[in-house]
Amino acid sequence: MKAQALLLCSLVLLAQSTDVDDEGSGEVFLQKVSSSVSITASLATTMLTSVTNKTTQNVSVTTIDSLSTSPMHNATSNTSYSQTTPYSQTSLSSSVLISTPQMLNSTPNKPLSSTKLTPKSQSSSQSTKTTKQASKNLTTSKLATSFSSTYMTTSDQPYSNNTANKILLNTTYIYLSTLSKITKLFMQEQNKTTQEPFELITPSSTERDSSTLSKHTNKLKPFKPKTQPIVNMQRTWIYPLTGIVSIVVLLIIMSCIHCYIRRFDEHFE
């Protein structure tokens, strides 16, 4: 029944993807690029075993479906599962590969791959082993940018709580150590004080004579404190006063000259 269903699905996809009209009634890619669609479905193996004593069944089906629409994209899926009842458990695994090749020789090849795995459980000892299942681990590298570049790799496989706690402790230790280093450097920079050298002049043992001491004492100038006036008066009134005095003096000089000239004229008349 499953094989018939797969064949019907492949025929429906083939009918929908082909073009009948000359103008094109199906999907048209960029500028009517000729696209070749090939769909293949193959049923690999189908096994059915039954045991009358314990009524166990084991079904192993492997299907490989590939859909390629060149030059746009192609997809391939591989699925394998086994089912045994009632004395064994069920295991299911699937892998999907999606790749996008070069489009019209203009864009670079960008392959995308993703794998989703479910853990396979142990079946009973009397059930037959299924076919080999594809497995792939995904590793992702992450850059931790907390004051220092630290690389961590995590895998998609399940791990225990102990490993998770170890990773958490390692990351917190690295963060705290870098933080403590930065705080130490900051405190050291703040504690630095500027020291200026100074010279202390002291008389040596050879300069204890009175002559040398008198020379040093003569060079010293007596300290005179500056006496500040009690009242600081504003001196802006001096400028108009000087102007008035100068005008009065000029008037006196001119009057004197005028009197002298009048007397001189009277004398010659």
UniProtKB/Swiss-Prot annotation:
Q: Which UniProt keywords apply?
A: Glycoprotein
Residue ranges of the region described as Disordered: 67-87, 103-137
Q: Where is the composition biased (Polar residues)?
A: 103-112
Residues that carry a glycan: 53, 58, 74, 78, 137, 161, 170, 191
| Glycoprotein listed as a keyword | yes
Ranges annotated as biased composition (Low complexity): 76-87, 113-136
Protein name as it appears in the record: Gene 51 glycoprotein
Gene source species = Saimiriine herpesvirus 2 (strain 11) (SaHV-2)
